[in-house]
Each structure stands twice: as structure tokens, then as C-alpha cells.
Amino acid sequence: MSNNQNINNEDSDRLLDIVLTALDDMKGVDVRVIDVRELTSITDRMVVVSGTSTRHVKALAEHVVLQAKQQGYKPLGMEGEATAEWVLVDLIDVVVHVMMPEIRDFYALEKLWSVGGRNDASDNASA
């Protein structure tokens, strides 16, 4: 692995830590990290988290964006905040899916992206 790849991995790990801390700060529920580096070139990791209401979903997503910006990361975009049943925050190396529990159950992203790949499936925040 080249030095540039090491720096990129360290940066990606730092961004993931920022995201997980932000979700923990706002009491995100059932936080899961899915390592998709071997499955796609779109992103390194996906984080899936539930909110307890649409207001909570939106607040979680906004807090992730705010914390990332404060640490010097520029989000590529955020989608879904109008209905706030599923808000996607694209931080390039980390994509965050903040979902209402019923939407999360229906789409089952953890199962979809962990088939044939490595799923960290870690509880990184308390419920």
C-alpha cells in the first residue's frame, strides 16, 4: 500500500470517528457500520442508523453534516430531509443513511451490502 493510500485510509477512519461521535451525541439508535471497500468504489463505508421520529432523523443528519464541516470535511450532499423518513448524507468516504425504523426494516441495507462482503455490523453507539 502506498503512502497516499495510508493517508486516505487514516482520513477515512477519522471521518468515520467524527460521524459515529456525532450520531452518539444525538442518540442515534442501532448504529451499524458496513465496510464496502471491497464491494464498490463509490465509498469506503456506509453507516446506517435509526431515528425515533422524522424530526430526530433530520436532526441526526444535520448534526453529522455540521460536525463534519467543523472538522474540515465538505459533504457532497444531503438528500431526503424534506420528508425525513430516510436522509442520506454523502461525505464521499462515508455515506450515512439515517432512517425511520420501518423504512430501515423495509430496505434492509445491512443485508444488501453485507452479502459476500465484510460487515463490521458493530454497535457503535448505545441505544
What is the meaning of each model-derived region?
Residues R55-L76, L88:
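Compact, glycine-rich, soluble single-domain proteins
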